[in-house]
From Swiss-Prot:
A family per Pfam: FabA
Protein name: 3-hydroxyacyl-[acyl-carrier-protein] dehydratase FabZ
Species for this entry: Rickettsia bellii (strain OSU 85-389)
Alphabetical keyword list: Cytoplasm, Lipid A biosynthesis, Lipid biosynthesis, Lipid metabolism, Lyase
Catalytic residue positions: H49
């Protein structure tokens, strides 16, 4: 099952310039998800990071991983219309390859553990089949107030 950008925008609240998942290419609810982010030179972060040699900031790669995980949560629960997903912890992030405009980030997230409203994930970003980044993180799912 694929999920296009229109449905992604129904599932998570992020918008330009902070929406960092372009498409979901595979999903197994309650287990894992794979998506893509096409990195383009016209994104605002490249104005300052770095003008002479644009490089995707590592923190935005982690953000893309967490957004993909939030989509997995929404599909696993059936909906997150009345829920909010909050990041609680980021652990063991490693950045192994420079990501730059023209690259396609292949992002994968797996649910490692779910207890009540706390979910733990492992995630990777690959470019051209090579590991670019990896991280583990924890999120809390809360009812909207």
């Amino acid at each position: 099952m694929t999920i296009d950008i229109t449905e992604i925008m129904d599932l998570i609240p992020h918008r330009y310039p902070f929406l960092l998942v372009d498409k979901v290419v595979e999903i197994d609810p309650n287990k894992s998800i794979t998506g893509i982010k096409n990195v383009t030179v016209n994104e605002p972060q490249f104005t300052g990071h770095f003008p002479a040699r644009p490089v995707m900031p590592g923190v935005l790669m982690v953000e893309a991983m967490t957004q993909l995980a939030a989509i997995l949560v929404a599909k696993s629960l059936g909906s997150t219309k009345n829920k909010e997903v909050f990041l609680m912890a980021i652990e063991n992030s490693k950045f192994r390859k420079v990501v730059q405009p023209g690259d396609t980030m292949h992002i994968h997230a797996t649910i490692d553990q779910q207890r009540a409203n706390v979910w733990k994930f492992s995630s990777t970003v690959k470019v051209d089949g090579e590991m670019a980044a990896e991280s583990k993180f924890t999120a809390m799912i809360k009812d909207k107030s």
